[in-house]
């Protein structure tokens, strides 16, 4: 578990803490990035892109007793095509096979803005997602959905590599 921002949190609201990305990239276990305010967890949004780290997140949510009795929404921001639908259905089937109360939502728009809007709209308590799936160089040039989600979300985030 780590906080979202360090000692300069009030002065650097547009940046995650300086150690956060380094810790998450090096971690061999999931990392919980705690929100500033405590919020009991009843509803979880799993941000899904079909990648390896997102599949790790699905497997963890399916197998961990921590998620027993919680509502799980698997949300994917992607063009509405057959491939996206199949990937989303596969994730839902895995979760339901493990006894999870899971549903799927295919979202329009850019991943970060569509997912943040969905979290707020559905009032989810926890965001679960894969993290930093691309190289640091690509992140510098294009940006990172993970970083945007950490900055824009007011929820705790459970990250998987």
Predicted regions mapped to residue ranges:
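Short, flexible loop segments at the rims of nucleotide/cofactor-binding pockets, characterized by
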Residues: 9-12, 50, 104-106
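Short, highly charged low-complexity linear segments
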Residues: 60-64, 104-105, 153
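Gly/Ser-rich helix-loop-strand patches that form or flank binding pockets
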Residues: 1-37, 119-161
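Amphipathic coiled-coil/heptad-repeat helices and related helical stalk/stem segments
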Residues: 16, 57, 111-112, 142
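Short acidic/Ser/Thr-enriched loop-to-helix initiation segments
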Residues: 13-29, 34-99
